UniProtKB/Swiss-Prot annotation:
One of its GO terms (molecular function) is structural constituent of ribosome. Disulfide bonds: none annotated. This is Large ribosomal subunit protein bL17. It comes from Campylobacter hominis (strain ATCC BAA-381 / DSM 21671 / CCUG 45161 / LMG 19568 / NCTC 13146 / CH001A). GO terms for biological process: translation. InterPro entries: Ribosomal_bL17, Ribosomal_bL17_CS, Ribosomal_bL17_sf. It holds the Pfam family Ribosomal_L17. Part of the 50S ribosomal subunit. Contacts protein L32. GO terms for cellular component: cytosolic large ribosomal subunit. The keyword NADP does not apply. Belongs to the bacterial ribosomal protein bL17 family.
Length: 118
């Protein structure tokens, strides 16, 4: 059965959603921590953790896979060469979501999503 195997649509078309996740991933790789809405953070966690798991191998194919997803040389090199080796012995759980506040304009729940430093 495939119940509950969906994803959050985030009120966007599929191409807009893909671009959003790509841009948020680049931001979290470069900065280590970003603030976004809670729903975006939860969806981003799944996307980022799959990329980090793939990047842990560090071989040519890992570079190719990550670059295909991010299309940013700087972020790809940071992810494969700096971020992923930190998690070489860890199986999943590379990110942390911390709820912060409700946004004043639309009362959306905000949260920080960050890479865990170990």
């Amino acid at each position: 059965m495939r119940h509950k195997n969906g994803y959050r649509k985030l009120g966007r078309t599929s191409s807009h959603r893909a671009a959003l996740l790509k841009n948020l991933t680049i931001a979290i790789v470069k900065n280590g921590k970003i603030e976004t809405t809670l729903e975006k953070a939860k969806e981003l966690r799944s996307y980022v953790e799959k990329l980090i798991t793939r990047a842990r191998k560090g071989d040519f194919n890992a570079h190719k896979f990550v670059f295909a997803a991010l299309q940013d040389k700087e972020a790809t090199n940071m992810l494969v060469n700096e971020v992923a080796p930190k998690f070489a012995t860890k199986n999943g759980g590379y990110t942390r979501i911390i709820k912060t506040r409700t946004r004043r304009g639309d009362a959306a729940e905000m949260a920080y999503i960050e890479l865990i430093n170990e």
